[in-house]
Amino acid sequence: MPWEKGAVAFGGFVAFFSSDLSFGVEGSGTGQLNAEDLLGLDSDLTVFRVGAMYRPGKSRRNQLDFSYASYDRDGNATLTEDITIDNVTYPVGAQVKSVFDFDIIRGTYSYAFWQNDSVRVALGLGIYAVPLRYELDIETTGGNTVVEGADTTLPLPALALRGEFRLVNRLFLNAAVEGMYLELNDFQGSLLDLNVGVEYRPWKHLGVGLGYNFMGVNVEGTGSNSDYPGVDFVGEVDVRFSGLFLYGKLSF
């Protein structure tokens, strides 16, 4: 059977971002602010990613897996247009320091309903924990103002579909998609996580891989007393990033 019992993978991911942030009560500002163009955040970032997988039982149809990556960015910019947040207008020329940090921590259980020596396809359920922090420090002629967005951790449940295909001996094609949409009281959230890549296993316990990942996350809080865990802010985050990742893999 070509499907591993367990594995640990680690490597680098070069991500390219498009992010929009909003602060405060809906209708009291200019709407979403582009974090890269207007607020000076880097549009690309190289991060370390780690993941682990284990398949209990002899059939190896059940699978538990985990992954982690941290995306921390800060920027400096001079406003090129007026922005309004909570009915306060900050003029062209104001100096803005921005912080936008988040982690993606994912755990998933899946079951392979189709598995043979060449193909493995599984369905599952996952949970994403997303520690999130974003804020602005705006300097005008009148002084400094710190505008807080959020500093919280959001749990996002997701459905998962996984596929592994043995192309030739030791060469595999892997694909996975996880997604969710949820609207509850003062919270609305959506997530799409798409991965596809090739993996070469020249030795029994060692492999290397190259893949592509796209991820889009949108979370919006409209009240500080929501029933949804972690929603203690008023604002919206809409972040999309994609890029290539290269990794090594230890299997057992």
Name the predicted role of every residue range.
Residues 1-12, 17-21:
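Outer-membrane beta-barrel biogenesis signature
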Residues 5-7, 45-49, 102-106, 120, ...:
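Transmembrane beta-barrel architecture of outer-membrane proteins
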Residues 10-12, 50-54, 107-111, 125-127, ...:
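Residues on the lipid-exposed face of transmembrane beta-strands in outer-membrane beta-barrel proteins
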Residues 11-17, 67-71, 112, 126-130, ...:
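Outer-membrane beta-barrel pore domains and translocons
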Residues 18-46, 70-103, 130-154, 182-187, ...:
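Extracellular/periplasm-exposed beta-strand and loop segments of Gram-negative cell-envelope proteins
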Residues 60-64, 117-119, 169-173, 205-208:
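Repeated loop/turn-to-beta-strand initiation elements of outer-membrane beta-barrel proteins
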Residues 159-181:
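Surface-exposed extracellular loop regions of Gram-negative outer-membrane beta-barrel proteins
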